């Protein structure tokens, strides 16, 4: 894994893997973000766009059930900007299973192409974060299980929903779903994936 900071305020993460035996590879990045800054409250007012028409419903153990479902008419539709908190407490079985958002999104961009997956905007600071990737999926986690035990910048605790994750990846539980994009890596093959977190300020 290689991390690069670029001149255009991008954190670029490049993943490469090889193997001498057939194996499963699905690398991702589980950093937490709060664009208001450390110790400045929850992320419920962050405005989020995810460029996906489908998401992966999960069981009570947060394992995908199978075929992706349309986001149309559900609290999972972020194709236009919504605040994270606008619908997170809706009476929805999937939100109940995850105690909020903790779901994979099937990105709309063409498979294996590098494209825009998500955009987050925090209105108080004006900070914007875009996620660009060549992965087929994006896991959106709204910090539903944060309890203050983990510390971030300045030693500030991550409390309930005070940070979010946008994790570019192949779909969770892919080895058990032959119809999902493959995560199998064989000898002689090279696994390569790239994800960029691009930061700017909206004035």
PLM regions: where:
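An exposed, glycine/acidic-rich loop-and-rim segment of catalytic or binding clefts
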Residues: 1-203
């Amino acid at each position: 894994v290689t991390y690069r900071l670029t001149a255009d305020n991008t954190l670029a993460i490049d993943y490469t893997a090889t193997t001498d035996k057939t194996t499963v590879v699905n690398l991702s990045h589980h950093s937490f973000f709060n664009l208001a800054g450390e110790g400045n409250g929850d992320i419920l007012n962050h405005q989020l766009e995810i460029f996906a028409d489908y998401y992966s419903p999960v069981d009570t153990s947060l394992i995908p059930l199978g075929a992706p479902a349309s986001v149309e008419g559900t609290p999972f539709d972020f194709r236009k900007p919504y605040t994270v908190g606008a619908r997170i407490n809706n009476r929805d079985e999937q939100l109940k299973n995850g105690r909020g958002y903790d779901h994979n999104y099937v990105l709309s961009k063409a498979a294996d192409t590098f494209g825009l997956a998500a955009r987050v905007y925090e209105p108080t600071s004006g900070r914007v974060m875009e996620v660009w990737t060549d992965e087929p999926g994006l896991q959106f986690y709204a910090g539903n299980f944060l309890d203050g035990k983990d510390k971030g910048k300045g030693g500030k605790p991550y409390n309930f929903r005070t940070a979010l994750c946008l994790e570019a990846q192949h779909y969770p539980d892919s080895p058990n779903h032959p119809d999902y994009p493959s995560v199998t890596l064989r000898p002689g093959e090279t696994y390569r994936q790239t994800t960029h977190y691009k930061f700017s300020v909206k004035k």
